[in-house]
Amino acid sequence: MDFVQTTVASFISLIPVTLAQSLILSFVVLGIMIPFRMLSFPDLTSEGAFPLGGCVCGVMLAAGASPLTAIACALLAGFAAGCCTAFIHLRFRIHTLLAGILMMTMLYSINLRIMGKSNLSVFGAPTVFDWVPFVQPGFPVSKIIAAGLIALIVFILLNMFFKTEQGTAVRAVGANPDMAEAQGINVWAATIGGVGLAGAFSALSGAVMVQSQGFADVNMGLGILINGLAALMIGEAIVGKQTVLRQLTAPFVGAIVYYQLVSLCLAAGMPPPDLKLATGLFVLAMLALPSLRRGRSRGPAPAREAFRE
């Protein structure tokens, strides 16, 4: 009983901090969802774009730039990284996963070049959290409000974008590139723009995270991809993925639930080094579950998702 009470008390005390962190990291999950679901383009650039945005933001803040300017520069850098991944795939016919691995590897050196060292402290620099009224800056409440407002704006803009002609073109390319090209859609522009948009959101997450934690590090994106996949799967299991609205909602819901589950595991005494193992096993189970269900049933196997190569 004492163990349960201690675990519950620790979990409740961590909820504000975890909620703020999950809202910030939900943009990475969004950056994973867009190429994966909208474009059928499995992409690994997020693991490099996340620290890229953090490094760019950290350098800009250290140079005296405003928080919004630093975030804008991080967005541009992440967009460029995503565009490069899509270009490598399209121009040189390299598999999407290999193109993402190449870009992620190169971004590590680029991040080191940007900062000039492996980590950079920006503690005390102005942040977007300082602008939240009636709340003391640096406290979880200010981070929840600021990150939640950014998430709401991003959600509304993306929902509007995917209802436009350009957004529909991106979805059409993901559904069937050959048919989209036959309909006069520029497959290159839609693919490069969509993957670039995903990279921009991953970089946005890194930039806001740096302003939240007060430092940038080249290794801050280590394991973020598998965490994002786990969060995306949880979100899709909760809200579904049948419509654009649900697909856009899933990353935010999944990120909040996933990081609360991580917080619960930590409160229960799970060693932090074991979290990545547990997350990997969870993702493996989610991916293997449909196959196991088909093995038990005698009905016809459902159609497999087709991804671009």
What are these regions (language model features)?
Residues 66, 81, 139-225, 230:
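Helix-loop-helix "hairpin" substructures at the membrane interface of multi-pass membrane proteins
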Residues 12-66, 71, 87-92, 233-245, ...:
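Single transmembrane alpha-helix segments in multi-pass membrane proteins
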Residues 10, 175-182, 186-189, 246, ...:
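Cytosolic-side transmembrane-helix boundaries in multi-pass membrane proteins
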